[in-house]
Amino acid sequence: MNTNKILETIKMIEEEKLDIRTITMGISLLDCIDPDGEKARIKIYDKITKSAEHLVEVGRQIESEFGIPIVNKRVSVTPISIIAGATNEESYVKFAQTLDKAADTLGIDFLGGFSALVQKGCTKGDKILINSIPEALAITQKVCASVNVGCTKSGINMNAVRDMGEIIKKTAELTKDKKGFGCAKLVVFANAVEDNPFMAGAFHGVGEAEKIINVGVSGPGVVKRALEKVRGQSFDVVAETIKKTAFKVTRMGELVANEASRRLGVPFGIVDLSLAPTPAVGDSVAEILEEIGLETVGTHGTIAALAMLNDAVKKGGVMACSHVGGLSGAFIPVSEDAGMIEAVIKGSLNLEKLEGMTCVCSVGLDMIAIPGNTPASTISAMIADEAAIGVINNKTTAVRIIPAPGCSVGDMVEFGGLLGRAPVMKVNENSSELFAQRGGRIPAPIHSFKN
């Protein structure tokens, strides 16, 4: 062990806000399927609480022994539309309540997997789950929902895209006392991954093991501090600096993942290489882009800087860890990033620029507040645009958007905690109604046929 390396890591944690964003245990619920909904829910509760009973305790032990902050302990489960589909129930809200109760019992921060995978079409269970989302998110505290509406191999399910615009509006309406907060726990995906440790989009894929440990790291502050030391130097040096820094951050993630795996007796899955910001100053992806040379994020050059950042993070992370996965890249959630918030307030960052940025980074339009009177068809069209970016570029994209009831452009919506605050952003007011109402499927792109 090199003493300088140890001191450097301590400095990264104490001064540069390096932390483990989440330890997420994935749990398969396939053995909980039962035609009797009540029995299924008992099995689900018992399986989750038994499997993850030591998750929070082990997380705290590792935090204390290694001195590494672990911000969240989470659980993801098999998409509930698959589990509940065996029942004859007309609503899956009770399943969401069971998940919430299990999360409370465990003392975890979030539980993901109130999900449906409908990229090619909907089963009966998928339709019921999607229709249950608004009420489920309104009456639970820790449950997160996600719906996958497209993938490169199948194209985009435009019926589901149309429906999700309505669902997001209903969710906002049912949680209007919290400015539409329910929508912060709902993600619409294209090319969703099965091993994502981050919320609100985590679910435990059917191709995964019985139980698995996935870890998400966070280190925008560390990358920014490293780049401050190479100001004025070429992009070659910038890329190399980011790569080396990402290596160090990911090494720490792998250490925690392996230790959690060993103590819990659960296999290690992946480390997600994503740079996840927080609302704290100095823990911002936007500030990294500005350190690269932009006056404010959103100006010309933003997409190129973000593309390089994303690629360099992956190159460094892949070298540091034998199993990487999840979303892996740079997150650009507006409400969770102090630099992004500032850029929106200044007027240098708009929705269209954010859309362009999603072409080259991890996810999509994330934690963006829009006026509460935005039509459902416009939200559906936003989802379609993001899904198209993901499907054509063979990458994960997503929409987590909050139509804040009673709010208009320029208002500030406060969510608190890691979710931060979001300035309400202007949306193109021209109608997409006829587009959204067409339905059907947008076919898979020609380059998806690889067999």
Swiss-Prot record:
It holds the Pfam family DUF711. It comes from the Bacteria. PANTHER family: UPF0210 PROTEIN MJ1665, UPF0210 PROTEIN SPR0218. NCBIfam families: PRK05313.1. Homodimer. Belongs to the UPF0210 family. This is UPF0210 protein CLL_A1718. It comes from Clostridium botulinum (strain Eklund 17B / Type B).
